[in-house]
Amino acid sequence: MHMKSLTFAIAIAGTLLAIVSTPLGIAADNALRIPAFTAYLEPDNGGARISSKSGVTSWKDASTKVLWFGELKKPGELNVAVELRLPQDANSKLRLTVADQSHDAVVKGAGTNTVTARFGNFTVAKPGYQKFTLESLNASGQSSGDIDALVLDGVTTNNTHFNYKSRRNAASVHLGYPVPKGTNVAAFYCEMTGVEDPVHTYYMACGWHRGYFGMQVNSPTERRIIFSVWDSGGEGVDRKKVEDDNRVKLMGKGENVYTGDFGNEGTGGHSHLKFQWKTGEKQRFVVTAQPTNQTFTIYSGYWFHPEKKEWMLISSWRAPKEGGWLRGLYSFSENFGGNNGHIARKALYGNQWIRTDAGQWLELTTARFTHDVTGKSDRLDRFMGVENGQFFLSHGGFNEGFTKSGESFPRPATGQLPDIKLPLP
């Protein structure tokens, strides 16, 4: 009996020794492995890189942190580790913070083999989204390792929600505006206010079946008012492949407005005005349709310049194989760069009106919420609602809750007809 117990103890000890001393690249069967290519960098200023092929690489700036976000639907104990690669015998000291608890780990490299930095147990006191913050405690310039994955034990896929795909953008979210049946829409007016303003944000006010009109945050120092109209035909990527009789043609543009081509999301004519629109300040947009015959329609985008206090033409385009009015009216909010999909975006959309071909103004007070495929299951932090009498769209930030796709909301009518005096295109 004593011999059997001794043999059993030696076997167990040998197993534990092997686990500790052997580089590990595979998580335990019941553990979750969250790929490093789903993480974010903070700040994202070149201190490391993230790619779908290699995860987090070139991490030599000790001020750069690696962040993962996920929803834990039940409280409890969580054992956390990080898989990484380091040069042979190189050391890296790392710190992981979860739920206001920080643990350190030192790991020795094994060349091309993966090693595991084990941070031990963390107590998650309440369900909800959690941030996993990985920091380097190494000297700046020293490699902290190439990160492959965050590994969680103590949870299962049934009570967690993470995005496992390399697309790190927040879900795109939309407002669809129903219009009375049989209405010929000659103009669509919408007021919009950016509440949050992270880089790579497109707040779009006036969209229709042939284009969209709104404002972007393109960099920390550049913002734009943007108006685009799609070509006819089915080309989705390269405008050089679009036949001339399918191309939209520029008819006019405003002062200092750039015009050109766009592709990769359909093709067409693009225009933008560089303007430092202000967060929290209402912007006013109107798009018009002028059918010239049964074949062509001229679409024009006008924006109210808040400094000049007058309406300005952004651009005007003649669309072939059209001849109709504005259809499929909508607004959206888009995170068009994936490196900062963890930051919340929010805008207000209000006082929507349409003008019929007979000159009658009708107020639109109902909107229907939808989202893109990312919002279906990968990113659930997407919302619509009514705030201060206006619709709002919000996405990103890993905030609690979500709005169901297809849900409609009413807003209170304002009765405030648009005061519009448009310049000719």
Regions found by a protein language model. Name each.
Residues I26-Q276, R284-P291, T295-P425:
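Extracytoplasmic
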Residues A9-V20:
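Bacterial N-terminal signal peptides
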